[in-house]
Amino acid sequence: MRPGQFAVTQATAINTDRTAIEAMRPSWLRLLFWVVLFQLAWYFRPLQDLLLHGAMADPDDFLRLHEVRNWLAGQGWYDVSVPRMNPPEGGDLHWSRLIDLPIALLTVLLSPLAGAEMAARVAAAIWPTTVLCLTLATLIAICERAWPKTNPFVVILFALTNIAALAQFAPGRIDHHNVQILLVFVMLLGMMSGRHWLGHAGAGFCMVLSLAIGLDNLPFIALLLGWLALAWVFDLEDAREGLLRTAAGIVLGLAVLYPLSVPLGQWMAVRCDALSIVYVSAMALAAAGFAALGFVNARNKAMRFALAGLVGAGALAVTALAFPECRAGPYSALSAELTGRWLSQIHEARGIVDFASRFGAANYALLVYIVLLLAAGIVLVRRRIASSHLLPVLAVLAICLVLSFLQVRALRLGVFAAVPVCVILADLAWRHFSAAPGRARAAAMFMTGLSALFLISPVWLVVANAVLPPPGNPADTAVAGDAPEWSRQENVSSICNRDTDFSFLATLPPGLVLNDLNTGPAILVFTGHSVVAGNYHRNGRAILETMDFFAADEATARKIATRRKPLYVAYCQPLPVAQPSVPSKKGSSAESIGRRILDGREPAWLQRISPAADRLNVYRMASDG
């Protein structure tokens, strides 16, 4: 068959399939109903705990809610500090009000009906589900561009089995991570919509929006810009127009979002960990370079590659020379001590090799899963089974693979990005099995379902953990009879996160609490107290002093308490299977204050005042302490 005949035949087949799909397509309302129903069923207990007890999964969610409350109470748009953290200076934060905005709007709208407190909880349930629905709608649109025969229900099936990523959309997950996932797929959809001027322009705008919200996606955006340049080098369809439109979107994003994110007086201030003149300069240089490449009429690929490399290297070099303090990345300002003792202990900030060496080789399963799907996608495009629209999807998969060696959390994004390839393979399997003469439809469905099991990521994790069980520590196993009463309750979190955990502390006169790091934000939400610290890197001295207090010996801990002058000390007991050993350069673990608190051997200058059955141990500082 000649290429022209193949193209006509393929176009005819696509149009026929598209007509058939449109005829049986479920309505968006029906899809929305099933997604919301899934959320209610899968997260029934977390939703119940959120509405009845204000429970959320992560300290960042509590601090986000506290930020929203502060803003609604009159704190300025540009002022995202936390006055009740690390007093008297206040907690310095790099967060964005852009995430606070929809949560605050929902809270205000619901307050007349439910009251302020319940309105905030309902808003915390609605917002993640809304972001999930938008993410799934974007994924469906991506799959339809890559494979016109897409069944939306199949997209939802593969997406909702990505348990690791789905946890970011659970009720109460109101911090920015789920929005960042959504923005990645909006960028991808824009790149796949090259024939529409809004596609690449929207992708460029979303790059800046993502950076304005947080720098989580910074490495991804850098590699995505590199992919766009490579598409121009190899003269892919609409690549030139894509560069120009992406540049326009970036410029528009900078013009709109930078003034919304940074007050005029700080436009020239250098901040390595948030949108600042550093990243504005880098993105503006990239946009200028893209615009220049778009007008270059070089036909030689080697020349194109050299020019694209010059643009990329030039933007990086100029930024590095102009802002040397940020050459080490967003966390350049952190001290070596804070990086070694605190940042390095954040598991998701580690690469896959380090993560797997600590938690077991079974964690390589998702890496292998994505590699195989990437290879399958390349074969589909090379054999023209799938169109070139799949190429941006494969680029995102490759980017996630590269980033996983820096941060393991890139894999959960990669599993989401692999959904279009899974949809295509599942559809091809159905067509193969249903085309066999004499085979019943039920048998074809069974064979397709069996094949689809290998495309579902949790199956890989289950098998990998069965073959390569994670390293265990016999000391980690708690005897049921020895476990405290609070730990026997259903759905107990790894952190203190219910209002009942803080009910006693809330009755005490307001004062400064020297707290374990994970508990600080919840104390701000559930009580009127101030806290010394939370896991927020700009407050490095407070973080280290808190770690030293609980991990050091009595003499060192007392010096810290004397310097900080707290009225209370609060320590959330960890789950019996997760007794901590906080890294510290001072003192020994066995005689640390944290260990002694857990063993009931606290020093005399700490007077236990909370009920013995409470999970949150609350102590009053003795008058001479």
Q: Which stretches of residues belong to each language-model region?
A:
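Signature aromatic-anchored transmembrane alpha helix within multi-pass, membrane-resident enzymes
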Residues: 308-313, 430-470
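Start-transfer (signal-anchor) and selected internal transmembrane alpha helices
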Residues: 1-48, 153, 295-312
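Active-site lumenal/periplasmic loops and adjacent helix-entry segments of GT-C-fold
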Residues: 44-145, 151-158, 162-183, 210
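Membrane-interface helix-loop-helix junctions at transmembrane boundaries of multi-pass membrane enzymes
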Residues: 236-244, 298-308, 324, 367-395
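Extracytoplasmic
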Residues: 7-15, 457-625
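Transmembrane signal-anchor helices characteristic of membrane glycosylation enzymes that use polyprenol
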Residues: 22-61, 66, 73, 80-83, ...
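Membrane-embedded helix bundles of polyisoprenyl
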Residues: 34-42, 127-145, 151-195, 199-233, ...
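Juxtamembrane membrane-water interface segments that cap and precede transmembrane helices
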Residues: 84, 110-117, 260-274, 331-364
